[in-house]
Amino acid sequence: MSVSDLRQSYERGVLLEQQAAATPIDQFALWFDEAQAAQVPEPNAMTLATVDASGQPSARIVLIKAFDARGFTFFTNYTSRKGEDLLANPRAALLFFWQALERQVRIEGVVERVSADESDAYFHSRPVGSRIGAWASEQSQPITREALEARERDFKARFGDTPPRPPHWGGYRLVPTYFEFWQGRPSRLHDRLRYRPDGKQGWVMDRLSP
């Protein structure tokens, strides 16, 4: 089936060097705030791309739970496919796509686990059903729906309303080494600004051809 006639003109914004923030995390924070103001559904949803030990890539949507100058934090099962990938190869890439604003942000970097205290704090902020779910799900392993629901009942009976954080579950932080901000423009002459480390604890910005 051909879908070659599906196209639209991007005309909702511009991205100029003189208007961009000096640091990529400040530019990201600005765009994130604007995505929230525009009521973009789940603006913290991102594609996380990882690569396993054999070089096979995989990608999935996950939600960031924090971002700051240190990087971008998300939580998951350590034994999931992405967890196994990151154990073998800690390099990963993130992609945020805010269609309503005709914007995307690409981020590359190295992923590290956050501290146990940070994982505990976030885990205990979650709804109890989600905390039970972290125990019930042997993420990425084959299972029937009936068996999954049976595991949920078992862990509800075991922990009640106070499940502890499972040892196989916690947080990761992607420490960025590369940012690219993309703003759709007419005639496919999009704006692309790239930030890279300058070797002096700062960042250098330049424009890429669309």
UniProtKB/Swiss-Prot annotation:
**Which EC class, in a word?**
oxidoreductase
EC numbers, comma separated = 1.4.3.5
**Where does this protein act, in terms of pathway?**
Cofactor metabolism; pyridoxal 5'-phosphate salvage; pyridoxal 5'-phosphate from pyridoxamine 5'-phosphate: step 1/1; Cofactor metabolism; pyridoxal 5'-phosphate salvage; pyridoxal 5'-phosphate from pyridoxine 5'-phosphate: step 1/1
Q: Which Gene3D superfamilies does this chain map to?
A: Electron Transport, Fmn-binding Protein, Chain A
One GO BP annotation of this record: pyridoxine biosynthetic process
Q: Which reaction does it catalyse?
A: pyridoxamine 5'-phosphate + O2 + H2O = pyridoxal 5'-phosphate + H2O2 + NH4(+); pyridoxine 5'-phosphate + O2 = pyridoxal 5'-phosphate + H2O2
Q: Which SUPFAM superfamilies match?
A: FMN-binding split barrel
Keywords for this entry?
A: Flavoprotein, FMN, Oxidoreductase, Pyridoxine biosynthesis
Cofactor binding comment, as recorded: Binds 1 FMN per subunit.
Domain of life of the source: Bacteria
Q: Which cofactor does it need?
A: FMN
For this protein, the record's Pfam families field holds: PNP_phzG_C, PNPOx_N
UniProt KW Ribosomal protein keyword:
no
Give residues annotated as binding FMN: 60-65, 75-76, 81-82, 104, 139-140, 182, 192
Q: Which NCBIfam families match?
A: pdxH, PRK05679.1
Q: Tell me the subunit arrangement.
A: Homodimer.
Described by its record, this protein's role is as follows:
Catalyzes the oxidation of either pyridoxine 5'-phosphate (PNP) or pyridoxamine 5'-phosphate (PMP) into pyridoxal 5'-phosphate (PLP).
Q: What is this protein called?
A: Pyridoxine/pyridoxamine 5'-phosphate oxidase
Q: Which organism is it from?
A: Bordetella avium (strain 197N)
Tell me the organism's taxonomic lineage: Bacteria, Pseudomonadati, Pseudomonadota, Betaproteobacteria, Burkholderiales
